[in-house]
Amino acid sequence: MSENSKVKFTTNKGVFVAEIFEDKAPNTAKNFLDLVNKGFYDGIIFHRVIDGFMIQGGDPTGTGMGDPGYKIKDEFGEGLKHDDEGVLSMANAGPNTGGSQFFITLAPTPWLDGHHAIFG
């Protein structure tokens, strides 16, 4: 089996790298990596930052309302939990409404399990 991809995030607060779980959330990972490779996320801000909870980005409008023009189905990989800081998940407005927006947890957030697809 091939190794999972890694994506580098460059922000005004520094640089970090995320492993993308192509092995555990293949459809969600493919969607995210396709957007990365198309340059969709280039220059997009983290429009929502909640200390002790999460940072959210991936909206081309910067308002929290933007998307790539389509929605993807939720994908909940076996064993994936919001049990630590640094979990990368799809943001959504309800079931099967993810697209491009994502968030990274700053603490364990178990109430999000089964509601937001983890892919990194």
Task: Put a short name on every predicted segment.
Residues 1-119:
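Cyclophilin-like peptidyl-prolyl cis-trans isomerases
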